[in-house]
């Protein structure tokens, strides 16, 4: 199941239209909420994400830290989950224990930072 979280109704409607135009009619859910509320909803429903892709507007840099911290403390991430954050290449979204950045890709003015848990189940460092 792929879950899209979008606070903008127009953007959520565009996601739905794009999926429909591709012939995708199932296997997804569009959650119309801000990231914090959506994370709480998804966590309460017992979901565990394999991948989380963050792409808040570049102007909302404070949201990166809040969202990474919320994800790091949530039950949404399993031991092998990967968090990918898109951001301006000049901006460093930082880390939120136990999430550690293990890769950064830069393309033009944009960058992708990849995170995963820094410790395994027994506390060993990865």
Predicted features by range, described:
Residues 1-126:
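Class I S-adenosyl-L-methionine-dependent methyltransferase catalytic core
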């Amino acid at each position: 199941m792929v879950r899209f979280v979008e606070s903008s109704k127009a953007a959520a409607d565009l996601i739905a239209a794009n999926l429909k135009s591709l012939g995708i009619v199932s296997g997804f859910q569009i959650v119309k909420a801000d990231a914090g509320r959506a994370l709480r909803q998804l966590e309460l429903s017992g979901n565990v994400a394999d991948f989380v892709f963050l792409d808040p507007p570049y102007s909302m840099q404070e949201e990166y830290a809040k969202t990474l911290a919320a994800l790091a403390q949530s039950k949404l991430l399993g031991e092998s989950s990967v968090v990918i954050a898109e951001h301006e290449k000049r901006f460093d979204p930082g880390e939120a224990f136990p999430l550690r950045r293990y890769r950064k890709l830069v393309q033009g003015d944009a960058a992708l930072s990849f995170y995963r848990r820094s410790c395994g189940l027994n506390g060993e460092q990865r």
